[in-house]
Amino acid sequence: MGKPAKKGRRPACLLPLAALAAGLLWAGNFTVGLTEVSISSGKLPAAFEGFRIALVTDLHNRVFGPDNDWLVARLEKAKPDLIALSGDIADEDSALSSLSALLPRLTAVAPCVYVTGNHEWRMKNRAEWFSLLEKSGVRRLSNRFARLTRGESEIIIAGVDDPNGPRDQKTPGQLLREVKAAAPEDYIVVLCHRNDQLENLANLGTDLVLSGHAHGGVVRLPFLGAVFGTHYEFFPENTEGVICCGETCMVVSRGLGGSRRLPVRIANRPEIPVITLHCKKT
């Protein structure tokens, strides 16, 4: 007769694998990666060669490390000249305590600009959130634009509020016409939440678009990429990276937080793209 099988061996062998899977899942949701992106343009003034923009989006009030120390440390490491907050930093049902501590630390790293995301227009404490941004020194570009200067040179950063906002708010077309009237030759960066505006903004004369919203597709699979779209359709496009339309490029961040209905990210680590601008020789 053969020796009886030892009970419990197989489950015990699976424990290290389960621990590894849990660790990878945790790291894939609560650690932050920096993604270096280079964008070149013949329109960029020489004074802005090497200008760095950190794109922070879709935090949804998630906390990375004690008091968001890990998130701030990543931004300090990136050494940005500007931090662009492209919406859904807050979440519709969350308290603002962690963000009230975080925002002043962000503005201590670099000047910050902000546009709304779709969830922030659903907040019951939206007025408190907007007030907190102002008190923390974050500049809200609510369908407005600002000039960024270096020496005697300038570029434009324009902010497009999310369409979940007021029905009578200024359209991207109206905003870009104002920009073109004020600075017809300037390099134009548009900060917006949604990742579906590239063609429209390209036609309006934008040079660079910074966006988020897609959460990188929430789940990413080898060879297939993003699994879920923002309307829960399968295998959406333009959920991360650099996408170009003519001379206009859009940087889409995978973002930092989780979807409300699909809160767990899989093979989709939270990220902060850091965009370095370069002068392209013509």
Residue ranges and their predicted role:
Residues 1-47:
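N-terminal membrane-anchoring alpha-helices
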Residues 40-54, 139, 145-159, 183, ...:
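Beta-strand-turn-beta hairpins that frame and shape the catalytic cleft
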Residues 47-144:
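Membrane-embedded segments
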Residues 59-64, 89-93, 163-169, 187-188, ...:
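Short, flexible loop segments at the rims of nucleotide/cofactor-binding pockets, characterized by
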Residues 60, 90, 119-120, 145-146, ...:
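Catalytic metal-binding/acid-base residues of hydrolase active sites
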Residues 81-82, 113, 138-139, 155, ...:
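Short, Asp-centered acidic motifs that coordinate Mg2+ and/or phosphate
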Residues 113, 195-273:
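Conserved beta-sheet core of the metallophosphoesterase superfamily
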Residues 130-131, 135-138, 144, 150-192, ...:
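Binuclear metal-dependent hydrolase catalytic cores centered on His/Asp/Glu-rich metal-binding motifs
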